[in-house]
Amino acid sequence: MSETNHPSRRSAMLQLAAGAAALNTTSAAAQSAASAPADSARLQKELSNWGRWGAADQMGAVNLITPEKRKAAVRLVREGASFSMARNAEIKEAVDNPAPIVRKTTRVGKGQQPGSAGIGGTSDTFFISYHGYAHTHMDTICHFLYEGKMYNGYSQDEVTEDGAAKNSIINFKNGIITRGVLMDMARHKGVDYLEPGTPIYPEDLDAWEKKARVKIGAGDVILVRTGRWARRDAKGPWPVSDGLAGLHVSCAKWMHARDVAILGGDDAQDVLPSRVDGVSQPVHTLALVAMGMPIFDNLDLELIGRESDRRKRWEFLVTASPAAVPGATGSVLNPIATF
């Protein structure tokens, strides 16, 4: 999400809640209160996957997507119907998108190529600053840091102006192929969308599992729909500083217990404000740094929400392939769901 060079991001986990590790067992009312800064190292250590797949690992929780997991996910395909979960690249500046894509046609189709016997052609170029709250993208596991370290203990010095020498997006160039599970929190609450600032707690995720009759398992991609884009369509864009619905920090422990491989959603994943004093994105930090769990941000889950609801099927094959850019901290993404 937002750049980790910002001081509040680089030191995000320094002030996690003293009781955060036990939040899964507390009530939503107790969880919703802002937590006091303390004991962040304990939670970072408790949810850590560092060394789990070896000292040289740069794949993190994606290691949980085994060959058997991929084959099982492919067997979910019954119809061959596929649906994109990417939002069309935003071309207009808005209060929630200060950096729209810049695209320019460099050659139009008029005329012919010299010596080409009537053959013409077109070309264009585009630039996109994908991290943030607008464009659909994948955060890789060098994107956030905690106390000068990224996932698996690699130093922040591994990321320079020349790119990331460790944990970059290039490690995922073979693609993501696994089971995806839509966790439609808006439908669960019986609304078109959750209001900004609405937290999602572990008990909400548990309740959705029961309702959907799907149990989250090792190697899954979970896709959390808040209805953000439905609200934007209905009411127009709003500043991110006004809040976003999303996961409370207590959900990090829930995901770790189930060995989730990748977290995705239609917003920034973290509820904003975060309800953790002094820490703006604790879910991001725990997922990326402690668990080595990549994140799919700003997905458009409206279509897949309707298609899943129509079928009453909330699990499907997910395929996604980031751009193979050595040293990159993430990538634009077009994840596909196939029934």
Residue ranges and their predicted role:
Residues 6, 31-339:
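Active-/binding-site microenvironments in catalytic and ligand-binding cores
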Residues 2-20:
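N-terminal secretory signal peptides and thylakoid transit peptides that target proteins
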Residues 21-22, 56:
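A generic secondary-structure boundary signal that marks alpha-helix termini
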